Amino acid sequence: MLKIETGRIIKSLSGFYDVRTENKVITCRARGHMRRGGMSPLVGDIVDISVEKGKGMVERIHPRKNSFVRPAVANLELLVIFAANVNPVTEPFLIDRVCAIAGDQEVPVCICVNKCDMDPGTDLAAIYRQAGYTVIQTSAETGMGIDELRNALRGKFCAFTGNSGVGKSSILNALSPELKLPVGEVSEKLGRGRHTTRHVELYDVDDALIADTPGFSSFDTDQMEVILKENLQYAFPEFGRYLGQCQFRDCSHRKEPGCAVTTALAAGEIGKTRYDSYLKLYEKAMQINEWELK
């Protein structure tokens, strides 16, 4: 009879999964029925594995608290979204889409405005503080914000995500210098970073567990989850205090008269770039039927 052990997937690469059990790390493959059933293991999954002749096999994936397509992780307790106001400048819509996906799954978000030694990103930080997010301004070069970020991560299973070249790996190195992760350069011609992180892998940093994930660009947004239009309003925390105050119960917060959200927008209580992102995501959601997401 095979011995079954339980552990967490800490690395996924080319169909192989490194699973950390109580006292060791075992490289495993997944049973074919998982792949055929459309539920492939993700970094962060709690799994049961069997080991025979030194080879591991993922037998079962425990129920997930949450899961993401991009970054490809499960069971997050905090998602840290990296952004910068210098080359490569982060598009607000990219931040907002990832924020909304996390909000839809009730995963807390921290916005890390990085490279503040080059540009403090004050306006960018203000947008997300106004929206109700935790915002930390950091610099791997000067150490700005590193201790504050360390405290925010403490005791949590987290993922670092953001566009390529925004400095996720540099901040991980600043948090834990012994990691010595490779750091890429930003292409001056293309204005975007080169990928240095090519797979998702977990790292122990103090008492936090951090997933470093590959960077993405605006071309990757179509691979991300789509939120049902009925749920989208709840994924924007700054809308919360106005929900239920609109003239119409089924208000979409777009063109309807008596909308409390658009009234707040006109009064400057909701940021315009955030609201514009809501409209773009709503348009995408209108093209999706609920049955397509199951």
Residue ranges and their predicted role:
Residues 2-3, 15, 38-55, 61-79, ...:
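Helix-rich effector regions associated with P-loop NTPase G domains
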Residues 25-41:
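Beta-strand/loop nucleic-acid-binding surfaces
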